[in-house]
Amino acid sequence: CYLDPRQGAIGCFEEACRNVVCTGANPIGMVDHLQFGNPEDPEIFWTFMESLEGLTEYAKFLRIPCVGGKVSFYNETPLGPIKPTPLIGVLGIIDKTPFLPVPTNNGDYLIIIGKTRDELGGSEYFEYIHKFIGGICPSVDFKDSKINMLAVLSLIKNKLVKSVHDCSKGGFAIAVSE
């Protein structure tokens, strides 16, 4: 979120939606807790506003209301302000029963839904393995995001999958191992 606050906040929101979708639920509401440094610093205030506008834009697109939230400013240490930290919770409704994953077997297929791009900016991989902070941040294509979530919900509803996991922190390798 600190490299591109708008896309970072949207990415947090989308990940929360994907987590709900992976249970077979349709996202219907969102709550947020936005944590930032001193808003009297113009750069920090700009970061906050960009994050807020990104969340608003994605919520309007998905028609998901923000039903509650909290903003926490002045989060700083002697070394300076914290990185912008949007925390997003999404609520969903399940039509019948929750999707309960079952163990996979040899011979089962692994299906990847969505596109991958060369967007590792701001990742822990870059920061901790390569000691690099920067790069191109992941961005969310709103239409593709919605189409992908609807596809996953359809697969779950039609009992065509044994388990579903979103790809987020740790990337593909962590998603597969979990």
Task: Give each language-model segment a name.
Residues 1-178:
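Glycine/proline-enriched, intrinsically flexible loops and inter-domain linkers
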